[in-house]
């Protein structure tokens, strides 16, 4: 064993003392620090917020550095993402600027299960399941009533609250981000949100449990070339209820679809397109840029897109009407064409 290993572990343990009240609780599964002084933890009742003066920015950076050294890794502006394991077996994801907002640091700790649960206990609270194949009945869709009535504000509000995957489409300056911010405001406050964008435009309630991640390229003058795909992968280790990706531009579209299809429903994103069908087509073509999709036929990827994206909202800025921005089309996979 490396002679420095015990010292490195001791350093991590020392800096983890500020989190001991939550790490020691058996009923807590996730611990998240979104910004200095603010901690969120998830127990059987959901997410809870706790203020902690010990979690200063300097302390968080010291913990990040100690964790990186313990794992023989680096965390710095050039390498702002760290996925590692703590001495106690907990998994940790750390994000530092420029991949998150200046003056912040994101820390997510997932505690391992301390016992092996017998199958009988795991299934104790299972919903009643049909004993005969094919006997299950589809649940009523609460979105169909406002959809049929053309009550679009109610429809979109319920869609967000129901965790539908929504794509906002439109041309430059059409109001895509404005609508995405309005939709984000309907996300239930109990959820944990991770946003991914190149420039901070998404606005969330400061009181909610959220983290803003930022990507860039060397040509934009950023110190770190962190891609949207890298941040999507990091976000999946940050206990998100849902992921908001400000704009889809390339192969990261496939990673976004994978995230939405793997238990992180309710994703919202935007793309440049003039109609719902063009948006679905563009999203399919973006997926084809992903290394894992380049040999897949268009029809296969189009089917994937339409199986994951529930709703496409098209916005438009019309000249000659006071440059008014408005919704001009809504596509709903489970509904009839919009009237």
Curated annotation (Swiss-Prot):
Regions annotated as coiled coil: none
Keyword terms, alphabetized: ATP-binding, Cell inner membrane, Cell membrane, Membrane, Nucleotide-binding, Protein transport, Translocase, Transport, Virulence
Residues reported in the UniProt entry to bind ATP: 170-177
GO molecular function, one term: ATP binding
The organism's place on the tree of life at top rank: Bacteria
EC number: 7.4.2.8
Any Gene Ontology CC annotation: plasma membrane
Protein topology in the membrane: Peripheral membrane protein
Biological process per Gene Ontology, one example term: secretion by the type IV secretion system
Transmembrane residue ranges: none
EC primary class: translocase
Effect of residue 175 to S: Strongly reduces PTX secretion
InterPro entries: P-loop_NTPase, Sigma_54_int_dom_ATP-bd_1, T2SS/T4SS_dom, T4SS_GSP_E_ATPase, VirB11
Catalyzed reactions per annotation: ATP + H2O + cellular proteinSide 1 = ADP + phosphate + cellular proteinSide 2
Induction (free text): Cotranscribed with ptxABCDE. Activated by the two-component regulatory system BvgS/BvgA.
Cellular compartment(s): Cell inner membrane
Pfam families reported for this sequence: T2SSE (PF00437)
Family: Belongs to the GSP E family.
Function per UniProt: ATPase component of the type IV secretion system Ptl required for secretion of assembled pertussis toxin (PTX) through the outer membrane. Acts as a molecular motor to provide the energy that is required for the export of proteins.
Name of the featured protein: Type IV secretion system protein PtlH
Source species: Bordetella pertussis (strain Tohama I / ATCC BAA-589 / NCTC 13251)
Phylogenetic placement of the source organism: Bacteria, Pseudomonadati, Pseudomonadota, Betaproteobacteria, Burkholderiales
């Amino acid at each position: 064993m490396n002679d420095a290993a015990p010292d490195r572990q001791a350093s991590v343990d020392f800096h983890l003392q500020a989190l001991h009240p939550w790490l020691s609780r058996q009923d807590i599964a996730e611990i998240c620090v979104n910004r200095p002084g603010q901690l969120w933890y998830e127990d059987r009742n959901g997410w809870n917020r706790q203020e902690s003066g010990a979690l200063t920015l300097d302390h968080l950076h010291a913990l990040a550095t100690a964790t990186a050294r313990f794992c023989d890794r680096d965390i710095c502006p050039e390498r702002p993402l760290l996925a590692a394991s703590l001495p106690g077996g907990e998994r940790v994801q750390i994000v530092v600027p420029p991949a998150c907002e200046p003056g912040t640091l994101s820390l997510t700790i997932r505690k391992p299960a301390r016992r092996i649960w017998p199958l009988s206990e795991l299934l104790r609270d299972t919903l009643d399941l049909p004993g005969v194949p094919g006997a299950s009945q589809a649940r009523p869709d609460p979105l169909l009533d406002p959809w049929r009535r053309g009550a679009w504000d109610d429809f979109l509000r319920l869609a967000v609250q129901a965790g539908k995957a929504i794509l906002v489409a439109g041309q430059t300056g059409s109001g895509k981000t404005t609508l995405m911010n309005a939709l984000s405001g309907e996300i239930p406050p109990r959820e944990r949100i991770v946003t991914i964008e190149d420039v901070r435009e998404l606005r969330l309630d400061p009181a909610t449990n959220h983290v803003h991640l930022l990507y860039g390229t060397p040509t934009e003058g950023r110190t770190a070339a962190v891609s949207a795909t890298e941040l999507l992968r990091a976000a999946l280790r940050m206990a998100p209820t849902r992921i908001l990706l400000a704009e889809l531009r390339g192969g990261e579209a496939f990673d976004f679809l994978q995230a939405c299809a793997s238990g992180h429903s309710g994703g919202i994103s935007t793309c440049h397109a003039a109609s719902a069908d063009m948006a679905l087509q563009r999203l399919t073509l973006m997926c084809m840029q992903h290394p894992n999709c380049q040999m897949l036929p268009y029809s296969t990827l189009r089917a994937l897109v339409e199986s994951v994206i529930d709703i496409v909202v098209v916005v438009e800025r019309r000249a000659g009407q006071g440059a008014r921005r408005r919704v001009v089309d809504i596509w709903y996979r489970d509904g009839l064409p919009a009237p």
